[in-house]
Design a protein with these regions (language model features):
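Short amphipathic alpha-helices and their capping/turn segments at secondary-structure boundaries
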Residues: 68-83, 249-253, 284-293
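Conserved, mostly hydrophobic/aromatic
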Residues: 57, 263, 329
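Glycine-rich loop at the start of a catalytic domain that most often binds anionic cofactors/ligands
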Residues: 64-76, 99-106
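Internal helix-turn-beta structural module
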Residues: 303-346
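N- or domain-start disorder-to-order transition segments that initiate the globular core
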Residues: 6-46
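Active-site-facing alpha/beta catalytic cores
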Residues: 2-5, 84-240, 244-245, 267-268, ...
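Glycine-rich phosphate/diphosphate-binding loops that line cofactor/substrate pockets in enzymes
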Residues: 42-50, 253-257, 348
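Conserved phosphate/anionic-ligand binding catalytic regions in large, soluble enzymes, centered on
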Residues: 53-66, 325
Length: 349
């Protein structure tokens, strides 16, 4: 009588992280660049670099060509505003779902429920390499605990999402990531889960994972000293007002944690209306102009074209439009970030 795998239909052996990296290796130039990007992000998060960290880009990437076109535009913009804003592009390949839905490029690269994960890993890593060669720092959400072994060497900032910030598995994983990590507050707006995560991620952990050769292993981490809070609003409403920022500062100070806060301009902070992201950016820039120093970053969901679309007909998708959360378009992004840089240039030193 069978006692295990009763609900498992199929198992597929994947390429190991070591094998994928051998097929798609990192050049020495990219290696040095990523190391430099991470150091810059660490310095901003630690409030040693006065620039604002802005993580911007598509909610998720489903079209490689559109992502590369977006990246080319973003690179030109980032060079223009680099004195005041350090731009990191969103390269999100995994999407957490409240119920069901498309889980991202790695899980389902063809958008047809075929779940060609081996292809998704290859496509994702190839794109990260190409974007890195353009000279862009990259950000992603660390969702599946195995995926970082395939991708994290090309990532300069990672997020732990609102649905997973409270997860022990994700806190342990984040303690071993090689880049700074932002923890979002809970979907209900609660700050405590993110604050607790900062304490956890800074500590060493031991947990089950996989090695570069794909073997199940006990992973022992040193702890990640560069965790920080990402305020994204919640069911109770937005949480980017001066009062919310001050409450977050007080909670961090109480536990002797660095007062370093990123504000997510989308999700509940925009009331799930992408057009309201500008209002969030304006509020935050006003707070910084008034002397706030704890706000070290912003997150903006942006694409080539505005809004979003359903994937019910994958062959009929509009180019450069999100298939997950709605985004602002490129012209709005360019205008918003240039305006932000101008405002930062005039802030008190």
């Amino acid at each position: 009588m069978q006692l295990e795998n009763l609900n498992v239909e199929q198992q597929e052996v994947l390429i190991t992280p070591e094998q994928l990296k051998a097929r798609l290796p990192v050049s020495e130039d990219v290696r040095e660049a990523v190391n430099g990007y991470r150091e810059t992000v660490r310095n901003i998060v630690d409030r040693k670099d006065p620039r604002l960290l802005v993580v911007v880009g598509p909610c998720s990437i489903h079209d490689v060509e559109a992502a590369k076109e977006y990246a080319q535009r973003l690179k030109r913009l980032s060079d223009d505003i680099a004195d005041h804003v350090f731009v990191v592009m969103r390269a999100y390949f995994e999407k957490p779902r409240s119920t069901v839905g498309w889980k991202g490029l790695i899980n389902d690269p063809h958008l047809d429920d075929s779940f060609k994960v081996a292809e998704g890993l290859h496509i994702g890593r190839q794109l990260l390499l190409e974007l890195s060669q353009m000279g862009l720092p990259l950000a992603t959400e660390a969702l599946d605990p195995i995926t970082p072994q395939y991708m994290q060497d090309l990532i300069s900032w990672s997020a732990i999402g609102a649905r997973t910030t409270e997860s022990q598995t994700h806190r342990e994983m984040a303690s071993g990531l090689s880049c700074p990590v932002g923890f979002k507050n809970g979907t209900d707006g609660s700050l405590g889960v993110a604050i607790n995560a900062l304490e956890s991620v800074a500590s060493p952990h031991r947990f089950l994972g996989i090695s570069p050769t794909g073997q199940v292993s006990v992973i022992q981490t040193k702890g990640n000293a560069h965790g920080h809070v990402v305020l994204r609003g919640g069911s109770s409403g937005p949480n980017y007002s001066p009062e919310h920022i001050q409450a977050c500062e007080a909670a961090l100070e109480k536990l002797s944690l660095t007062q370093s806060i990123m504000v997510d301009c989308s999700h509940a902070n925009s009331n799930k209306d992408h057009r309201q992201q500008r209002n969030v950016v304006n509020s935050v820039s006003q707070q910084i102009a008034a002397g706030n120093r704890s706000i070290t970053g912003l997150m903006i969901e942006s694409h080539l074209h505005e809004g979003n679309q359903s994937i019910s007909n994958p062959d009929g998708l509009s180019y450069g439009v999100s298939i997950t959360d709605a985004c602002i378009n490129w012209d709005e992004t360019d205008s918003l970030l240039r305006q932000l840089a101008e405002q930062l240039a005039s802030r008190p030193s």
